[in-house]
């Protein structure tokens, strides 16, 4: 029984090849690993937080992981299946900049209304600061989540309406690579 489970059905494999940037072999490899970590075939938010936390040993990644989980959980059923996992992984790891930015926008847009409010940005940025802990040295104008949020809004909120549209978000990020760094909070880019 366990044997047949470790192979994806041909139609699922074909669907994933069409909708991700992964090869047959990579998809099969990811599937094996996914089943090893999630024998049920579904990942709960608690399991996801545990796995995600392993990547950030010096901080608390649980809040940020919840936001990532919500964005991965495309159908909103409270679990991540292999298809949702691989599609999100494809965008975040191999997607073009615009795809990554759309994905990030959907994570920051907590209420799904098509805009990122200052409060939504602050919530995500605060979660990022908790996650990276004391590992990253921030410039003075980014030393707190509030300061970083203000800086992002100053640079992105073109029409000064106190919220970011998808267009403002994408244009702002494309015109200023430092914003992408601000959004990602990637320790490697410092």
UniProtKB/Swiss-Prot annotation:
GO molecular function: calcium ion binding
Residues reported in the UniProt entry to bind Ca(2+) 2: 109, 111, 113, 115, 120
Annotated residues for binding of Ca(2+) 3: 157, 159, 161, 163, 168
Lipidation (N-myristoyl glycine): 2
Effect of gene knockout: Viable. Adults exhibit reduced night-time sleep but daytime sleep appears normal. RNAi-mediated knockdown in the whole organism or simultaneously knockdown in the C01 and A05 neurons, results in a similar phenotype to the genetic knockout.
Superkingdom in the source lineage: Eukaryota
Binding site for Ca(2+) 1: 73, 75, 77, 79, 84
Function summary: Calcium-binding protein that is essential for promoting night-time sleep and inhibiting nocturnal hyperactivity. During the night-time it promotes sleep by limiting synaptic output from arousal- and wake-promoting neurons within the C01- and A05- domains that include the mushroom body, and the antennal mechanosensory and motor center. Regulated by the circadian clock network and light-sensing circuits that include the CRY photoreceptor; it is likely that both of these internal and external cues are required to define the temporal window (the night-time) during which this protein functions.
Protein name in UniProt: Neurocalcin homolog
Native source organism of the sequence: Drosophila melanogaster (Fruit fly)
Gene name as annotated: Nca
């Amino acid at each position: 029984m366990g044997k047949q489970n470790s192979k994806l059905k041909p139609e699922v494999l074909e669907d994933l090849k069409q909708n991700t940037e992964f090869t047959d072999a990579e998809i099969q490899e990811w599937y094996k690993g996914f089943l090893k970590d999630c024998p049920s075939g579904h990942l709960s938010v608690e399991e996801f937080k545990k796995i995600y936390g392993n990547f950030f040993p010096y901080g608390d990644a649980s809040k940020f992981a919840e936001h990532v989980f919500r964005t991965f959980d495309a159908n909103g059923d409270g679990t991540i299946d292999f298809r949702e996992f691989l599609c999100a992984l494809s965008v975040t790891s191999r997607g073009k900049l615009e795809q990554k930015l759309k994905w990030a926008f959907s994570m920051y847009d907590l209420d799904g209304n098509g805009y990122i409010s200052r409060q939504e940005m602050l919530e995500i940025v605060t979660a990022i600061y908790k996650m990276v802990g004391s590992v990253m040295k921030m410039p003075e104008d980014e030393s707190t989540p509030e300061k970083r949020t203000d800086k992002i809004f100053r640079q992105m909120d073109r029409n000064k309406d106190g919220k970011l549209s998808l267009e403002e978000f994408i244009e702002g990020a494309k015109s200023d690579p430092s914003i992408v760094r601000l959004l990602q909070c990637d320790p490697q880019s410092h």
